[in-house]
């Protein structure tokens, strides 16, 4: 991987002038899935919301391919248990195409192809005309990821996409996201507490600690330097704990 997708320069993040992390400098590559780990309150969700444009940076800059980031370049999937009454899976996923539709909001043949392909990518082919609320939490999460895929953005940010899911669905979703990153050349950044799965499945780990910035490296290298132990205050690889 050699194509830089996201690059930050002394990025400082927070809210209401309260600084959560300062002077963050990192680069993410096209075609990789990065899992962001760290203790609660260290700024993981704040970073995602800042990159997505939902809240302003306090200082510094961040770019995509050396250009200032635009909302149309990023898809964001937040953690939430949605209940959408009387709405089909197709209609939920189609919301991701609305920025590209005609003035009247009509879907073109290409839009429909993208919707079906996105559902196929998340393993939900044939579910277009089923109702969203009839699906399990894991399936709903995959529908929302399919919606993000239909936006055709080079970057997808996900905040705790496996929350509330059982282990098989957690594994399935992370494996699917890694495959999408590699096959479609997307940059996927995930905030998660799934330490074991992140270490096994991500290309790199972004390890964040309160007020101390981030370390971005492979899980093997971070373990070798003791970074995980320093971040979480204990030897997370000790089977006796």
Spans of model-derived segments:
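Helix-to-loop junction immediately C-terminal to a conserved catalytic motif
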Residues: 52
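H-loop/switch region of ABC-family ATPase nucleotide-binding domains
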Residues: 192-193
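Catalytic Walker B motif of ABC-type/P-loop ATPase nucleotide-binding domains
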Residues: 156-159
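Conserved structural motif at the start of ABC-family nucleotide-binding domains
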Residues: 6, 20-23
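Conserved ABC ATPase "signature" region
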Residues: 94, 109-127
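Conserved ABC ATPase signature
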Residues: 131-135
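The feature captures the beta-strand-to-loop junction immediately N-terminal to the Walker
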Residues: 37-39
């Amino acid at each position: 991987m050699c194509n830089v997708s996201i690059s930050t320069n002394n990025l400082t993040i927070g809210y209401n002038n309260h600084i959560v992390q300062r002077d963050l400098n990192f680069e993410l590559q096209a075609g990789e899935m990065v899992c962001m780990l760290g203790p609660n309150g260290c700024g993981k969700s704040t970073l995602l919301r800042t990159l997505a444009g939902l809240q302003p940076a306090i200082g510094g800059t961040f770019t995509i391919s050396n250009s200032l980031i635009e909302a149309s370049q990023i898809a964001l999937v937040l953690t939430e248990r949605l209940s959408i009454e009387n709405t089909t899976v197709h209609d939920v996923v189609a919301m991701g195409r609305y920025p590209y539709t005609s003035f009247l909001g009509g879907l073109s043949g290409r839009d429909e192809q993208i919707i079906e392909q996105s559902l196929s990518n998340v393993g939900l082919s044939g579910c277009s005309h089923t109702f969203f609320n009839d699906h399990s939490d894991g399936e709903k999460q995959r529908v929302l990821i399919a919606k993000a895929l239909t936006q055709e953005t080079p970057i997808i940010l996900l905040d705790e996409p496996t929350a509330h899911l059982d282990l098989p669905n957690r594994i399935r979703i992370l494996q699917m996201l890694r495959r999408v990153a590699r096959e479609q050349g997307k940059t996927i950044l995930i905030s998660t507490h799934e330490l074991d799965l992140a270490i096994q499945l991500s290309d790199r780990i972004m390890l964040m600690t309160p007020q101390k910035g981030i370390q971005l490296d492979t899980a093997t290298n971070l373990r070798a330097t003791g970074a995980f132990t320093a971040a979480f205050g204990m030897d997370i690889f000790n089977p006796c704990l």
